[in-house]
C-alpha cells in the first residue's frame, strides 16, 4: 500500500494495478461472484495481461462476504468443515487474510495476481545487536521487560528490503502501461 515507501522506489502493487486499469469495483448490490470470477472480473483482468493467478490476498472483512456467497441452489460456496478450518481458495488459488492491520481496505478489498511476479530482496546487510541490560517499554511508557532483573537477553535485528514487480513483454497485452500481473477489487461506485 506504499506505506513509508521511499519516494525514489517504484509504486506498490495497488498503485501499479490502478495505473494499469486492473481495478474492479464492488458497489452495493453487485454480485461478488461475478466481480471475482466472471469475464469482467478481477481474475480475468490478470489473464488479459497474460498472467495466471496463483494467489489472492484480502482484507479480513472479505471472509464474511465470501461465506455469504451461495450457488444457484442456495448452498454456500465456501463450506465449513467441523474438524478443520475452512481453507479459502478462488479458482484453485489460495487466499490469505492478513490479520495484523496491514491491509488497507479503503484502497483495496482484495489483491489477486501472479505472486511469482512480485520479487523482493535484501538490499542492505542485516545487522544484529545483543542486549543483556536495558528495559523494553510498552507504548504507554510502562516497562514490559527489565532484562537485567529477569535475567533475559534481547536481540535486535535490522534489515532493509526492496521490491520489484517485473513486467515482462508478452503478446497478450503489448502496452506495458496497461499490462499488470495484479488486479484489485475495491469498494465503491464504478467510475465507468
Protein language model regions, located:
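Alpha-helical scaffold segments that mediate packing/assembly in large oligomeric complexes
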Residues: 1-44, 89, 96, 178, ...
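Long, contiguous amphipathic alpha-helices that act as assembly "spine/axial" helices in icosahedral shell
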Residues: 1-18, 45-57, 61-62, 95, ...
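Sequence/fold signature of self-assembling virion shell proteins
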Residues: 72-192
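Extended alpha-helical or coil "stalk/linker/tether" regions that are enriched in polar/charged
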Residues: 27, 33-58, 65-83, 89, ...
Amino acid at each position: 500500500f506504499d506505506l513509508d515507501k521511499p519516494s525514489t522506489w517504484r509504486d506498490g502493487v495497488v498503485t501499479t494495478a490502478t495505473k494499469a486499469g486492473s481495478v474492479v469495483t464492488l458497489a452495493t448490490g453487485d454480485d461478488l461472484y461475478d466481480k471475482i470470477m466472471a469475464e469482467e472480473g478481477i481474475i480475468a483482468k490478470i489473464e488479459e495481461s497474460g498472467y495466471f493467478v496463483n494467489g489472492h490476498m484480502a482484507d479480513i472483512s472479505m471472509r464474511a462476504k465470501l461465506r455469504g456467497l451461495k450457488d444457484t441452489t442456495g448452498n454456500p460456496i465456501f463450506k465449513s468443515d467441523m474438524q478443520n478450518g475452512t481453507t479459502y481458495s478462488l479458482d484453485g488459488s489460495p487466499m490469505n487474510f492478513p490479520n495484523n492491520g496491514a491491509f488497507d481496505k479503503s484502497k483495496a478489498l482484495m489483491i489477486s495476481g501472479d505472486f511469482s511476479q512480485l520479487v523482493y530482496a535484501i538490499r542492505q546487510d542485516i545487522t544484529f545487536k545483543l542486549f543483556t541490560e536495558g528495559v523494553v517499554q510498552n507504548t504507554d511508557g510502562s516497562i514490559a521487560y527489565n532484562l537485567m532483573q529477569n535475567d533475559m537477553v534481547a536481540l535486535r535485528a535490522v534489515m532493509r528490503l526492496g521490491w520489484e514487480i517485473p513486467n515482462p513483454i508478452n503478446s497478450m497485452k503489448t502496452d506495458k502501461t496497461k499490462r499488470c500481473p495484479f488486479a484489485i477489487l475495491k469498494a465503491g461506485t464504478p467510475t465507468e
